[in-house]
Each structure stands twice: as C-alpha cells, then as structure tokens.
Amino acid sequence: MARKPGLAPKKVPLQKLNKTNPNFSNRQKQIQRSKQEDEHRKKLEEIPEDNTSHMFFSYNEALVPPYHVIIDTNFINFSISHKLDIIHSLMDCLYAKCIPYISDCVAAEIERLGSKFKVALKISKDPRFQRLTCSHKGTYADDCIINRITMHRMFIVATCDADLRRRIRKIPGVPIVYLKGKKYTVERMPDLLQ
C-alpha cells in the first residue's frame, strides 16, 4: 500500500524509561536474570568431563569383591515382578559377595510411587541395603546416580532404565547390571563369564 504524499506517519508517544518508572526496574531485573542464566549455562558447558581415556580398553581396577552395587527404582520393581531376590541374584550373577546401595533420591522416588509399590518400599528399607545420603537438592534419582558414579568409579549400577543405561555407557569403567529374561546380566565387566 502506497502512502499518500504529504502525510506524515503518526507518532506514537513512547513511554519514558527512567528509574522512576516501574517498567524500567522490572526490565532491568529481567535483563540481569537472563545474564546470570547465560553465565551459568556457559560455566556448565565449559566444565570438562573427566572421561579417563586410559580406561577405555581396560577395566576398572577399583571394582573388587565385595562389589558395591547402586540400585535404581525400576530395577527393584522389575525384580519384584519377576520374583527375584535382589541380593542372592546379584551374587549369582557377579560370582561374589555384593553390597547393595540405595540413595536417598531412589528411596524418595519409591515413596512417591504410592501404595501400589509397598513391596518395593519394604525392600528398600531392608537393613541389608546400605543407604547413601544425598547432599544435593531435588530428588531425581538418575542424575543422583550419574553424579555419584562419575565421582567414585567403584560402583556397579543396577538399572533397567534404557535412558540411564545409555548415559552410563558414556562413562568408562562403570559396569551395568540389568534384567534380561528372568535373570540378571552384567554389561562391561570383562572378568566375568557372560
């Protein structure tokens, strides 16, 4: 659409943004928050992952009997549904004594599942299972397990969660126990016969 000659566009009065205007302070706060979030994201991206490449073709020498096994929520649930005793089945699978560990995040996740999973809650409170206290905020169990095994590579992770297993495979030297058929299977543990 062509403009008629001689007509000037309407001027819309702009609000003055100064320190007395409430929109100014809100806008400044939004800008400050976005800058802080960007800085936080950059810091997270800059943190190098400590993937030890010397462990790529060998196994983790910190894994010695008795094995320390971190157990995930769905591993407990699948073991119950297949009527497997967790501790005895782990010992049969790994051919050695095992010490099962449950983090506070996993226990909180089981409690949140409700009355349908009373048996899983009872198993998680078994005195044979060691409790790992969590110092972080939030109760997302997968992140808790990933953080713990990246810090200390002395654990074997027992999970049936495909996404968690995919994330663990990126960390060298951490074996995974999962349910295959009606028995436990170990992945990335070279000294065991599969």
Curated annotation (Swiss-Prot):
Major place of residence: nucleus
Region entry Disordered, spans: 1-41
Keywords: Nucleus, Ribosome biogenesis, rRNA processing
Annotated Gene Ontology cellular component terms: nucleolus; small-subunit processome
Compartments reported by the entry: Nucleus, Nucleolus
CDD domains according to UniProt: PIN_Fcf1-like
Skewed-composition ranges (Polar residues): 17-33
Ranges for domain PINc: 67-166
Gene Ontology BP, a term: rRNA processing
Pfam families: Fcf1
Known function: Part of the small subunit (SSU) processome, first precursor of the small eukaryotic ribosomal subunit. During the assembly of the SSU processome in the nucleolus, many ribosome biogenesis factors, an RNA chaperone and ribosomal proteins associate with the nascent pre-rRNA and work in concert to generate RNA folding, modifications, rearrangements and cleavage as well as targeted degradation of pre-ribosomal RNA by the RNA exosome.
Family under the similarity heading: Belongs to the UTP23/FCF1 family. FCF1 subfamily.
Subunit structure: Part of the small subunit (SSU) processome, composed of more than 70 proteins and the RNA chaperone small nucleolar RNA (snoRNA) U3.
Protein name per the record: rRNA-processing protein FCF1 homolog
The organism of origin for this protein: Dictyostelium discoideum
